[in-house]
Amino acid sequence: MTILTFTLILFLGTFIAGLLGSLTGLGGGVVVIPLLTLLFHVDIRYAIGAALLASIATSSGAATAYVKEGITNIRLGMFLEIATTIGAVVGALIAIYMPTNTIAIIFGVVLIFSAVMTLRKKNEHALEGGSPLAEKLKLNSTYPVDGQKVPYKLTNIVGGFSLMGVAGVLSGLLGIGSGSLKVLAMDGLMKIPFKVSTTTSNFMIGVTAAASAVVYLQRGYMDPGIAFPVILGVLCGAITGSKLLKKMNPKTLRLIFAVAITLVALQMIYNGVQNKF
């Protein structure tokens, strides 16, 4: 395979990754890492390094549009980033010394969890009574629905903050942004409307990934030949996805995505058990 062919295939694959990451709030890494390791046989640590950069690109591309539309809760995102950033650095340091096959198995398990999370019932309603802590931290906000701003309130701030720390560790360890856990924390525990939790997750993923990427960069796990087409493809896909989100019902997409991700996850787990990484 020539360098040009490799670059074009990688660009197309990561374009799809960015598109799906933007539409589902999971980040492009859930597709980028299996693509690099299973198809191109790239060392999983280099794949994680590229995926972290891809997550930054996905977050940047999608988050810009969502912030302009007033959907993203920026104050909440920056508050929760305290937990995820600390967790991300810890996870990245663990990944440096953990066997690659073990990382692959954990990655597969988290992918299956992510697939299940995409199919769960989403919270589309704004909570009327929030917690005093959310009020004190000024985390309650509004989001646009049919041209009107709908207020919503948050609950279980401590539980959501704690789960964000776990999401940060997995992000640093696996390079996938841990969007599913972030959405679970905001949508499931804190009772934020799903569209707000998805867009805020996209906003946060880039900051979390940047913290992890520093560790991988210092250890030499960033290859420009891999990273450049990955960043370009994911960024283009993320921008496209942010425009499509307003015009489509993503339920069918989530179902197809969940099935595909589950198959990829099983392959990752199998290869990890067979010591093929």
Question: Residue spans of the language-model regions?
Answer:
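Generic transmembrane alpha-helix signature in multi-pass membrane proteins
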Residues: S60-I71, L170-S171, K182-D187, T208-M222
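Conserved glycine-rich helix-kink/hinge and helix-boundary motifs of the Major Facilitator Superfamily
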Residues: G49, G77, T198-T199, A258
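Interfacial segments of multi-pass membrane proteins
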Residues: V32-Y46, G172, L181-V196
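Transmembrane alpha-helix interface/packing and boundary motifs in multi-pass membrane proteins
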Residues: T14-G25, A62, M164-L174
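Juxtamembrane transmembrane-helix termini in multi-pass membrane transport proteins
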Residues: T24-I82
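Juxtamembrane transmembrane-helix boundary motif
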Residues: M1-A17, L38, I44, K68-G168, ...
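Short hydrophobic/aromatic, small-residue-rich stretches within specific transmembrane helices
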Residues: A51-S55, S201-I205, I226-A227, I231
